[in-house]
Amino acid sequence: MEFSIKQSPLSVQSVVKCIKMKQAPEILGSANGKTPSCEVNRECSVFLSKAQLSSSLQEGVMQKFNGHDALPFIPADKLKDLTSRVFNGEPGAHDAKLRFESQEMKGIGTPPNTTPIKNGSPEIKLKITKTYMNGKPLFESSICGDSAADVSQSEENGQKPENKARRNRKRSIKYDSLLEQGLVEAALVSKISSPSDKKIPAKKESCPNTGRDKDHLLKYNVGDLVWSKVSGYPWWPCMVSADPLLHSYTKLKGQKKSARQYHVQFFGDAPERAWIFEKSLVAFEGEGQFEKLCQESAKQAPTKAEKIKLLKPISGKLRAQWEMGIVQAEEAASMSVEERKAKFTFLYVGDQLHLNPQVAKEAGIAAESLGEMAESSGVSEEAAENPKSVREECIPMKRRRRAKLCSSAETLESHPDIGKSTPQKTAEADPRRGVGSPPGRKKTTVSMPRSRKGDAASQFLVFCQKHRDEVVAEHPDASGEEIEELLRSQWSLLSEKQRARYNTKFALVAPVQAEEDSGNVNGKKRNHTKRIQDPTEDAEAEDTPRKRLRTDKHSLRKRDTITDKTARTSSYKAMEAASSLKSQAATKNLSDACKPLKKRNRASTAASSALGFSKSSSPSASLTENEVSDSPGDEPSESPYESADETQTEVSVSSKKSERGVTAKKEYVCQLCEKPGSLLLCEGPCCGAFHLACLGLSRRPEGRFTCSECASGIHSCFVCKESKTDVKRCVVTQCGKFYHEACVKKYPLTVFESRGFRCPLHSCVSCHASNPSNPRPSKGKMMRCVRCPVAYHSGDACLAAGCSVIASNSIICTAHFTARKGKRHHAHVNVSWCFVCSKGGSLLCCESCPAAFHPDCLNIEMPDGSWFCNDCRAGKKLHFQDIIWVKLGNYRWWPAEVCHPKNVPPNIQKMKHEIGEFPVFFFGSKDYYWTHQARVFPYMEGDRGSRYQGVRGIGRVFKNALQEAEARFREIKLQREARETQESERKPPPYKHIKVNKPYGKVQIYTADISEIPKCNCKPTDENPCGFDSECLNRMLMFECHPQVCPAGEFCQNQCFTKRQYPETKIIKTDGKGWGLVAKRDIRKGEFVNEYVGELIDEEECMARIKHAHENDITHFYMLTIDKDRIIDAGPKGNYSRFMNHSCQPNCETLKWTVNGDTRVGLFAVCDIPAGTELTFNYNLDCLGNEKTVCRCGASNCSGFLGDRPKTSTTLSSEEKGKKTKKKTRRRRAKGEGKRQSEDECFRCGDGGQLVLCDRKFCTKAYHLSCLGLGKRPFGKWECPWHHCDVCGKPSTSFCHLCPNSFCKEHQDGTAFSCTPDGRSYCCEHDLGAASVRSTKTEKPPPEPGKPKGKRRRRRGWRRVTEGK
């Protein structure tokens, strides 16, 4: 369509963006000088023929469109080539143009605006009463050609006054800026999609800038190849394409319409599309560009964890689809744009999205014919061939054009194959799909059945009653018949699943099932039981209660105003009967294909569909219209699970919100059958829950119910299950568990208090095992075992692999695994080597895991009965994503990864397994199997497994498995370190903040009598009485003045300890030193900084705490000694001074002051400290052990270790001189010279283990203590018996090279020695065969230095004990 507007001769021709213009009279004036009306006549004529596009605007003046400034990204002079573009993508409108003709063109050198008519096609003139686009008026101005001007003038002359007033009201309707933009962009798409448009000769004269390339308008066009980035997925190859609903490939997004989006389709084996922001697109150049894009994305990552995530390789789940997309993209890059669009553009048939048959065939996917597609999607051939039905001819042109748009807007649905995992995101959202349930997702909640419960007529009435108000609000001038036609056109576009939403659920009388779904399980107020819907259960279970996720405010508001809306819409006779019958819920939810997405997302009401919570392998699964990329103008989604066209209001209790632990109500489990459900709660002290059937009851008892144990008063111990009267209850109110004191003491997590004990069910075993000093184990939501006192935090991070989850807060832990007879993989297996020295021998085996040790390696005696290793006693269990070694069948120990049951294939999930078993993924072979703790042990960095790896067969597979396991181990380690670092940087470790010292145990705080407190000579009239610069006697003696004794009284300035007058400080995270304390203001030299506050303990308690810290790997100490009997421990309790770090050149020092008779420690500045400087003091650490802690203070005189004296100036100068002196040249030793490596076996018995090494130079012999007849290691320098005569103890001269027998010169004559072929002697206790066998393990006598054979590390003194590798 072409439109022309006559302008003044002084105007300059340019193309306008839209039709409705508001200009000042001097800018857009008529020829006679009169100001035309800013509102142009609504009646218009449309000319469907070729014509030139010309319009004139005042040069240099910013145009105003609908009262708004023109959009900056498309200036008026860039729309000159609209003349050859298809209007809104309509078929048959390739020659339609918009033309504005001037009334007078005098003085302008442009040819007359004639309308060239196509040969054989007469000029068609249609009078449009109203035109709609997306449910809104498209043109509201009068657009007149030469022939239409007379018609408009005649109509204006014949108008009645009331018609004029009505027309003026219509003019006040504001034109939607989004539709204005959509008009222009639709025309741009049409221009690009029609390559055969003919050039108009008059075009170059009237629009001199028409030939400018379209790339100046938009960065990408249809057919362009790009990389797109979707959150959580790698860069993916795409092609820009037109949206089937909007008929445009680009649009503006955000509140200010300042962020541009492009519609792209993803390459791969599944047809998927999305709207992506321009900043998330990069032009495609080839596969080699991928690494560069990943590096650039990582540079912009806000956190280290995000950077690691962006740089990690593509997961195996996405690799195949991504590689297929790369192949298709590179193939498309070699084609022309037209060939590319013809081959790779998706087919939109009915309400389904399909791959091009040629592409599907190449991808190995069975492609349907177009006829089958149309038949399956419900599109009739008749409607496809004859889009203009007889009924459509009766519809006015405005509505007909609206219907055309809606009929061509086909909603999409992803490929039904759940195995597809290419990127997908239906921006306009598939109306047939449930909210947040893309392909591959499970629907874990109760969804509406697909079958319709009412006939089509009743459903249509509900649909009309629901959406009639919105249509009326948007088209106030439409009649009732027109409203009904619009609703019918929208109804015809809905799929069967969408229509099923408008069943009697929205009627005045609710069905019985709606009442059943109300969630009222039983009438008892105290019973908070909620039935958890298991993901494997039927999705149509009717007895599952539902939980309200969000209440629609529009729905609540409209229920209150039903009568008002009924009265307001009663004038529409065609819909009056339907409205009066169905008037319960009037909510805003227009058709998905006919309403802007953002508005639909906000205004749509509750749609009964399922939420899928399992993570999809496709980026489109997590990418909705509201979260394509983080544009600053983007509006946030109301819910993370909202799709583009419908909102979810109800989900079952198995929602992700419940999985995150948001629900605070406890879910009870029957104590007899260990299953949830409708339970009867005991109101006694046990707080138990029971099924009526388990108790043998048919109905709920009246009045107060108590179980048999509470009624008798004899409870059973939760550990040993014996019923006795000496059991005690846990002090936690809601716990209700009873224990024998001896039984509960066996668990290290039991906390004894003055009023009783807190049982282990209130602390996480995993958190305590990993860090016993961390108070976190007792915080957070717990999942507790129903059979024993074991609990874990909710979530996969703490929950042990193999636990059976029976409710949201109840499990059966792995300790209850029962091995079945006849199943070989249930048998317990132990390794055949020691976990310490890696040698065989007599091993002590753990009864719970495969670990084995030499008793000597653990420095213990061989225990009697069953024995458990330290890890098993501490409660350490395997967790998901742990890398382990697994023993299965006759195979060697094989590296594998612990998997979550929901992440393994369905056939593995269905395998029969017991409580305590978990699935593992074997590296190399890519197999899965169920195993348990007794056949696995953790993988450690550097493990190599079997030394016989080979290059063929299973040996090569094992070698690949080791490489994969090592890579996966490092990847998981980095992820966990990044997560721990992020958590630790949030806030300092917890402690209790106190203001004054708190005595602990027998320690007392001294308080002096007022008469004993010294009195200073200061006067209240002094400038600074008792101040920092005064001559206060108490300050000089480091006594604090007492307010009742000091002559200065309230003016005394020597009460910093009592008044806690500290300068303002703050806690910061330092580099390499943990947390530190910095000053927020300048501090003068000698000024009081802080008091060192904590618990006052005695030396006995101090040593006990240090011992406990060493046993539990606690390396941080906060102890400061006041005197022999009192020590300040600021670890569990303290103030900000506990965060001050050590420095060898500190800016603060500790001084002991006497405050009210008691000695207290203060920190004072030793120099002027500017603001922002870290506060430090010298710890003067007293080391109790031999290990030293490295000092990281960075001072010039740093001693290198905490506790060592800092280097003095003399020491530093001597070190400088020593550096300057010439170093003596040393002779380079030959390889192996001067080194001594001990043997790995005992020289007497020949076995390995914990050995004592000989201190004689060049001697490599080692012995067991038992072989030497010693009970403990010898002290000091020790020489083995081989160097001393067996008879007299003198130095030996004759040696047996097979045993420690040796003799001096006096006694060697009576001993028979023989020689081996290599010249080595041996005593008579050995025969020649043994000599030949063991001769390779012997050395020459000590006088002759032999070559070291073993790989033992040299140690000093009696501590030289071999350790196996």
Swiss-Prot record:
<dbReference type="InterPro" id="IPR036910">
    <property type="entry name" value="HMG_box_dom_sf"/>
</dbReference>
<feature type="modified residue" description="Phosphothreonine">
    <location>
        <position position="544"/>
    </location>
</feature>
<feature type="domain" description="Post-SET">
    <location>
        <begin position="1187"/>
        <end position="1203"/>
    </location>
</feature>
<dbReference type="InterPro" id="IPR047442">
    <property type="entry name" value="PHD5_NSD2"/>
</dbReference>
<dbReference type="InterPro" id="IPR047435">
    <property type="entry name" value="PWWP_NSD2_rpt2"/>
</dbReference>
<feature type="region of interest" description="Disordered">
    <location>
        <begin position="1333"/>
        <end position="1365"/>
    </location>
</feature>
<dbReference type="GO" id="GO:0003289">
    <property type="term" value="P:atrial septum primum morphogenesis"/>
</dbReference>
<keyword id="KW-0656">Proto-oncogene</keyword>
<dbReference type="InterPro" id="IPR006560">
    <property type="entry name" value="AWS_dom"/>
</dbReference>
<dbReference type="GO" id="GO:0140954">
    <property type="term" value="F:histone H3K36 dimethyltransferase activity"/>
</dbReference>
<dbReference type="GO" id="GO:0003290">
    <property type="term" value="P:atrial septum secundum morphogenesis"/>
</dbReference>
<dbReference type="Pfam" id="PF23004">
    <property type="entry name" value="PHDvar_NSD"/>
</dbReference>
<feature type="region of interest" description="Disordered">
    <location>
        <begin position="149"/>
        <end position="170"/>
    </location>
</feature>
<dbReference type="InterPro" id="IPR009071">
    <property type="entry name" value="HMG_box_dom"/>
</dbReference>
<dbReference type="Pfam" id="PF00505">
    <property type="entry name" value="HMG_box"/>
</dbReference>
<feature type="domain" description="AWS">
    <location>
        <begin position="1011"/>
        <end position="1061"/>
    </location>
</feature>
<feature type="modified residue" description="Phosphoserine">
    <location>
        <position position="121"/>
    </location>
</feature>
<dbReference type="Pfam" id="PF22908">
    <property type="entry name" value="PHD_NSD"/>
</dbReference>
<dbReference type="GO" id="GO:2001032">
    <property type="term" value="P:regulation of double-strand break repair via nonhomologous end joining"/>
</dbReference>
<dbReference type="GO" id="GO:0003682">
    <property type="term" value="F:chromatin binding"/>
</dbReference>
<feature type="DNA-binding region" description="HMG box">
    <location>
        <begin position="453"/>
        <end position="521"/>
    </location>
</feature>
<keyword id="KW-0479">Metal-binding</keyword>
<feature type="domain" description="PWWP 2">
    <location>
        <begin position="880"/>
        <end position="942"/>
    </location>
</feature>
<keyword id="KW-0158">Chromosome</keyword>
<keyword id="KW-0156">Chromatin regulator</keyword>
<dbReference type="InterPro" id="IPR055198">
    <property type="entry name" value="NSD_PHD"/>
</dbReference>
<feature type="binding site">
    <location>
        <position position="1026"/>
    </location>
    <ligand>
        <name>Zn(2+) 1</name>
    </ligand>
</feature>
<feature type="binding site">
    <location>
        <begin position="1141"/>
        <end position="1142"/>
    </location>
    <ligand>
        <name>S-adenosyl-L-methionine</name>
    </ligand>
</feature>
<dbReference type="GO" id="GO:0005634">
    <property type="term" value="C:nucleus"/>
</dbReference>
<dbReference type="InterPro" id="IPR046341">
    <property type="entry name" value="SET_dom_sf"/>
</dbReference>
<dbReference type="Pfam" id="PF00628">
    <property type="entry name" value="PHD"/>
</dbReference>
<comment type="similarity">
    <text>Belongs to the class V-like SAM-binding methyltransferase superfamily. Histone-lysine methyltransferase family. SET2 subfamily.</text>
</comment>
<feature type="compositionally biased region" description="Basic and acidic residues">
    <location>
        <begin position="552"/>
        <end position="567"/>
    </location>
</feature>
<dbReference type="GO" id="GO:0140938">
    <property type="term" value="F:histone H3 methyltransferase activity"/>
</dbReference>
<feature type="binding site">
    <location>
        <position position="1193"/>
    </location>
    <ligand>
        <name>Zn(2+) 3</name>
    </ligand>
</feature>
<dbReference type="GO" id="GO:0005737">
    <property type="term" value="C:cytoplasm"/>
</dbReference>
<keyword id="KW-0597">Phosphoprotein</keyword>
<dbReference type="Pfam" id="PF17982">
    <property type="entry name" value="C5HCH"/>
</dbReference>
<keyword id="KW-0804">Transcription</keyword>
<keyword id="KW-0225">Disease variant</keyword>
<dbReference type="GO" id="GO:0060348">
    <property type="term" value="P:bone development"/>
</dbReference>
<feature type="binding site">
    <location>
        <position position="1016"/>
    </location>
    <ligand>
        <name>Zn(2+) 1</name>
    </ligand>
</feature>
